[in-house]
Every structure is written in structure tokens, then in C-alpha cells.
Amino acid sequence: MKIRNLDLTRNPINEEHRRLGLPPVEEPVSHPGTHPFLRAAVWFTALVLIALTLFLMGRLFLPNNWAGGLQIIGETLNGSVFWSAVAVGFFAQVVDGALGMAYGVTATTFLLATGASPAVASASVHIAEIFTTGVSGISHTKFGNVNKQLFVRLLVPGILGAALGAVLVTQVDGAMFKPFVSAYLLLLGIYILSKAFRQLRLRTQAPKHVGKLALFGGFVDAAGGGGWGPVVTTTLVSSGNDPRTTIGSVNFAEFFLAFASAAVFALLMETNTWPIIAGLVFGGLFAAPFAAFLCKKLHAKTLLILVGTLICALSLYNLYRALAA
């Protein structure tokens, strides 16, 4: 058995965890700033966001293209596509940041409804997710929602799976994976709902097979346009792990997956959906800090119910769409 530094004090959070049969809060999670690795990950994320913003601004306005850049911005702001994407981006990021899932599913559904191909939809969502998951991940870390050990175990396999999925979806239609993934998620959603209403078994061991789970989750996320949160978060939460720290860790790891898959998409295909990407980013940036705060304040049982209900509803909807196609 792996020895873990648990906070066993009698505080409101641990009392609720005891009633639900969830693990006690871990001391490293309560004090995330003491971990150099998490601090380095936060700084890397912030630097990537700044560098990408400067790069895109340079592509828009340089060299000596201020008039053309302002014209493009004006046309984008006056278009209905941009503001529709803003609304979708805000809603999708609130759901994803607070529950750890469904940003890709929500946003991809919108893009597919506009006529975009699965490859273009997935590319647009993952490029936008670089910004939204970056801000959300930093917020989760600051609120103490990230478990360093779990985050590290998710990182490399998840990145590898996302890169492989991005390569596949540019060659084969990723929609063929949807029926199988949706059926799997529906069963997990039902299982999570049952956990919220019965005594859970206390777990003190680290979750098993996290690397394999992250590899699969990253793959279906890039190939199908969404699924990292539903696959990884629901599996870990349904195994009896703390919803708050699981959501925060999975959400922060998603930034690095989005960065890797977006790089592969940029190399293998061209996309002209920048107004949609800009709208998703703009809406998501406003929602990310609010979602992390919501995750911090909601009770564990409430999170279990919300996660289970959301997964069941989305899985039924996606399964119906996939089978009716």
C-alpha cells in the first residue's frame, strides 16, 4: 500500500467525505503551493498563453497591417457566428470547469451543426481549449483543487493519446467511435449517480491504471472532438476518488493535451474557422475562474449528482445522434 499524507482533522469537508465514504482530503492538495512541479506547470501554462497571444496578434497586425487587422476584427465582431460561439464557449467552459467534462462535446455539437467536418470541429475546439483549459487549470491550482500525484500520472499518457487521436481523425472519420464511447459513458453516469445515494467504500490507495485510462481518454478526445473529461473524470470518480481534486487534476492536465493535439492539427490540416475559435476562447475565458470557484464551493454529493446526471444526458443524446446518422 502506498503511504499518503492525509489530512485527518475534523473539518466540514472531511466530515462530508466521511458520510459519503470518500477519502479524506490530502495534505498536498490543501497546500498546492508547496509543490515545485505544480508551480512550474502553472508558470509554463501562463507563458504558453502569453506567447500564443503575442504570436496571434503578430500574425494579425504585422508587418504594417494595422488597417487590415482592425477590419478583420470589426467583421468578426459584427458576425453572428462569433457571438454564438461566445455563448457556447461560456456555457461549455462553466460545465467543463466545474464538472471536469463536456466542453468538447458541447462545443463540437455546435460546430457540427454549422456544417463543419469532424476533423475541423475537433481542431477548432482543441485550439480554443489551449486558452480555456489553461486559465481554468491555473484557477484550479490556486483554489487547491489539483492533486499533484494524479496530475503527473495523467500527463504523458494523455498527451500521447491526444496526439495519436489527432493524427487518426485527420485521416479517418472520428464519428465512428461515438456509439461505443457514448454507451460506455452512459453506464458510468448511472454508476456515479448510484454512488451519491449509498455508502461508498473508503479508498486510501492511489487510483490504478491511470496511465491506460489517460491514453484512451486523450485518444477519444482528439479523435471524436470530446471525451477527455467524461472518460477520465467519470472513471476516476466512479472508482470512489474525491470529485473535487479529481476534477481539478483532470482539468489542468487537459491544457497539455489540447496543446499537443492542436499542434498536430496545425501540422496536418488547415482551418479557416478563426471567428468560431475566437468566440469559444472569449466566452471561455470569462467562465473559467467562476467554474473553478464553483467547484471549490459545491458539496461532494452535489458534484456527484451533477456529474452523473450530465454524463447520462449527454451520453443518451450522443448515442441517439450516432445511431440515427
Description of each model-found segment:
Residues 53-57, 164-168, 219-227, 261-264, ...:
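Hydrophobic alpha-helical transmembrane segments in multi-pass integral membrane proteins
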Residues 60-75, 167-175, 265-274, 322-325:
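Membrane-interface helix termini and inter-helical loops of multi-pass transporters
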Residues 47-48, 158-163, 174-196, 280-292, ...:
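Selective transmembrane alpha-helices of multi-pass membrane proteins
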Residues 1-45, 53-75:
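Intrinsically disordered, low-complexity non-transmembrane regions of multi-pass membrane transporters
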Residues 52-66, 135, 142, 182-205, ...:
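Transmembrane helix exit motif
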Residues 50, 124-196:
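Membrane helix-loop-helix hairpins that form the core translocation module of multi-pass transporters
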Residues 3-23, 70-75, 82-158, 210-223, ...:
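Small-residue-rich hydrophobic segments that form or flank transmembrane alpha-helices
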Residues 40-43, 83, 123, 176-183, ...:
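Alpha-helical transmembrane segments of integral membrane proteins
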